[in-house]
Every structure is written in structure tokens, then in C-alpha cells.
Amino acid sequence: MLEAATPPGGDIVKSVTGTLDVKYRFSYGEQYDRFFREMRDNKRIMGIACPKCGAVLLPPRPYCGFCYTPVDEWVELSDEGALLTYTVVHLPFIGQPTEPPYIYAFIMLDGADVQFPHILGEIEAADVRTGMRVKAVWAEERKGTLHDIKYFRPV
């Protein structure tokens, strides 16, 4: 339920407090389409390489985020990498990939120049260390989303 906040002596609503459920549809576009199809159909993580600065971007995008050059060279990345940082999520919120508590991490996949966010599994939070090697665990049934990778586990 929404509640309008009316200032004293005025009739102008300056803010509204409440919760809105917003439904939307996001179009993948050319780069995301191939990225998610490759994960779904081939268990492959694809990046895109910049011809000017050489950066390998993940997820793929039409322009390099470092030098703003158009990019179109696809490269297959490893499904292994190094854990750069992480946090333990304790509070529930809409759209979570799993029930809390869980470990949310930023991973630098081998061959990529951009961090890949995902969850960690098969490990307790007390045992997680930055720099540790991790590997993707693929979902049995893949649908063309980030959840095609169930989680990353220690190598």
C-alpha cells in the first residue's frame, strides 16, 4: 500500500512511501543472445575482445568499456577463475538466486578482464579466501540465463 506524504500547510505530494512490484521485459540484444545461448546449449562462457586495447569483456557488449571501441571478436573463456572478493548474504530479498545465507562473489575468469558476479557453493563462508581458484558448476537443465551456472565451487 502506498502512502502519500503531504507537507504541513500544503497540498503538494513530495514523496510516496510503499512497495511497487514492477514487471518488465528485458531484450537481450545480439551480444547477450549469443552469450546466453552458448551457456545454455554448449556450457561455454563467451566474452568479446576489443580490437584496440585487447580487453576481454564479460558479459559481451557492443562497445569496449575501457576505450569505447566497437567490438565484435568472440572468444571462449574458461569456466575457472580466481575469487576476487565476496560477501555473505543473510537477508532475503526478491529475485535471489537461492535462500540465504549464501556467498556472493566476484570472480575473474581466466582470460577475462572484467569480474563476473555469481554465487559460491560447496564451501562454508569461514573457508572462503580471496585469490582461491573456483570452477563453474553447470545446471542440469539450462534455460539461457545466468542460472545456467548453478554456482562456482572451489577447485
Question: Each PLM stretch: what is its role?
Answer:
Residues 2-45, 154-155:
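A broadly conserved sequence feature marking short terminus-proximal activation segments
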Residues 17, 116-155:
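Well-ordered alpha/beta subsegment
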Residues 44-47, 61:
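Residues immediately within or flanking Cys/His clusters that coordinate Zn2+
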Residues 49-52, 63-69:
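Short, cysteine/histidine-rich loop/knuckle motifs that typically chelate Zn2+
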Residues 56-57, 70-71:
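Cys/His-rich microdomains that often coordinate metals
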Residues 73-82, 128-132:
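Short coil-to-beta-strand transition motifs
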Residues 84-121, 125:
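Glycine-rich active-site loops that engage anionic ligands at enzyme catalytic sites
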